[in-house]
Regions:
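Alpha-helical transmembrane spans of integral membrane proteins, capturing the lipid-embedded, hydrophobic core
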Residues: 11-19, 37-41, 45, 69, ...
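Alpha-helical transmembrane segments in multi-pass membrane proteins
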Residues: 5-56, 103-104
Length: 219
């Protein structure tokens, strides 16, 4: 019961900061950037604590059957990259000059007063951990026990994509299709393997190098 309450508190805090404050009220400026970064770090740490059993299980699964988990890790990476290439090609065909609002906001963030190390920790490490906790461990892991995975996984992927969008326009939607496919691949992988560290590791690996390169280019 206590763990269920903690998960609900984590979800509520995530919704308040990243949906209501950022998407609905649309608070802007460096104040909200600091809020987002601190929320990612603090809620990411809280997510590690709340889902510590799931993370420990993932680590144990690597010890029990390392070859199986390596194959799933590689397969998940290849599937994610392949679907991302296809969806990016669709954007290239339909909107070749469009740059998503999220890409612009990330580049602007590294020109703000927020230190690069804070941005990298928030967006490259704790942000991915928090998002995996919400969309995979909480939604897919919990809801698929009561609702069909064929419903839960696509819905979770759709929500994951929607939370990264900054406008309800077709170009913005098309530019974020890779997020939907990533959510599908990560959701299926977690549901089948029960290993949370695969999607967490890939999510961090997907974000961290890009952020470091942006920080270097802006410096």
């Amino acid at each position: 019961m206590e763990k269920r309450i903690n998960k609900s508190i984590l979800l509520f805090a995530y919704v308040v900061v990243f949906l209501i404050c950022v998407k609905v009220i649309r608070i802007r400026g460096e104040g909200i950037l600091w809020t987002q970064c601190l929320a990612y770090i603090l809620l990411g740490l809280l997510a590690v604590y709340i889902f510590r059993d799931e993370i420990k299980t993932g680590v144990k699964l690597w010890k029990i059957n390392p070859i199986k988990n390596v194959l799933w890790l590689i397969g998940c990476f290849i599937a994610d990259m392949g679907l991302n290439i296809l969806s990016n090609y669709l954007q290239y065909v339909l909107y070749p000059d469009y740059i998503s609002m999220q890409e612009n906001s990330i580049e602007r963030a590294f020109s703000s007063s927020v230190p690069d190390i804070v941005l990298i920790l928030a967006l490259g490490i704790f942000g991915p951990i928090l998002e995996e906790a919400i969309y995979r461990l909480f939604l897919v892991g919990n809801l698929s026990k009561k609702i069909s995975s064929f419903i839960v996984i696509p819905v979770s992927a759709l929500l994951f994509m929607a939370m990264h969008m900054n406008a309800l326009t077709l170009p913005e939607l098309i530019s974020h299709l890779p997020k939907f496919f990533t959510g599908l691949v990560y959701g299926i992988t977690y549901k089948v393997t029960k290993n949370s560290t695969i999607s967490i590791g890939l999510h961090v690996f997907n974000n961290l190098p890009t952020l470091i390169l942006i920080a270097i280019s802006v410096a």
